[in-house]
Amino acid sequence: GPEPDAGIYLRGTPQVQIWDTARTNVGAEVGSGGLYNNQQNPSKPLKVADQKVGEWNTFLIRMIGERVSVWLNGELVTDNVILENFWDRSQLIFPVEQIELQAHGSKVAYRDIFIKEIPRPEPFKLSSEEEKEGFRILFDGTNLDQWTGNKRDYAVESGNIVLHPSQGSGGNLYTKDQFDNFVFRFEFMLTPGANNGLGIRTPLEGDAAYMGMELQILDNDAPVYEKLAIYQYHGSVYGVIPAKRGFLKPVGEWNYQEVIADGDHIKVILNGTTILDGNIREASKNGTMDKREHPGLLNKTGHIGFLGHGSKVKFRNIRIKELK
């Protein structure tokens, strides 16, 4: 039709763009297949792959988690890009919604529409022992409903929380609830040179390493970290208590970690080995190792958070038991 302009909504959200590349007055020369309404993530296709107006085009669209790939006439035009939530950009895209065929007052025809659902990972479940002990799940691999903060760069993919830092930092993702004394269990996978942190008893604002407490999550074998201070290695209470070294799995393998926070006593168990066992009040009574102020070190309660430092990291199977 005149000035063709249409699209395909995924999970009720616009849209994979369809338009006439001759409409240069609206930017259509970039081609169809882009995620038109994106603002933070790429919105334009990688190349022009459209047929002439009046000829049939073939789309293959794949969506896994929040990420979309689009092939137009056999050409990859959108490569694993996050589809932003047009209706509320502070939130992730809806986990389940309808697919919609859209047109802007011009004639467009669709035919031969097929769909194949991709199985979702089975939600993580507690062991019977953990159920008896009173653990509860904070992340089961399916959603971030119990979390707040940067849900743009921390995304659910294949049963994991995956941090894709877009602006060089990655930002922070926090539990909605606050916790005082607890046993916190999770698994994580590092990439080469990765740097993250586990904030505990921290507020939602400010630097968690000082306004709360940060337990390092770090590929400290990477050459870039060869001159670390002893209180900066993985598992350390940052700036306060150093952890033992040498117990991380190789980069690309899953690590299992347990953190016990009981009053002033902090314990970190990595892959079955206790790498930190200390008292934050005793360790800081004559000043901290980094000689900086840590006003939140002795907080009684606060949020638990993953603290991004510009690196891709994966997390899974997150659960907690509150201690009385």
Question: For each of these PLM feature ranges, what is it?
Answer:
Residues 1-324:
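Carbohydrate-interacting regions of secretory-pathway proteins
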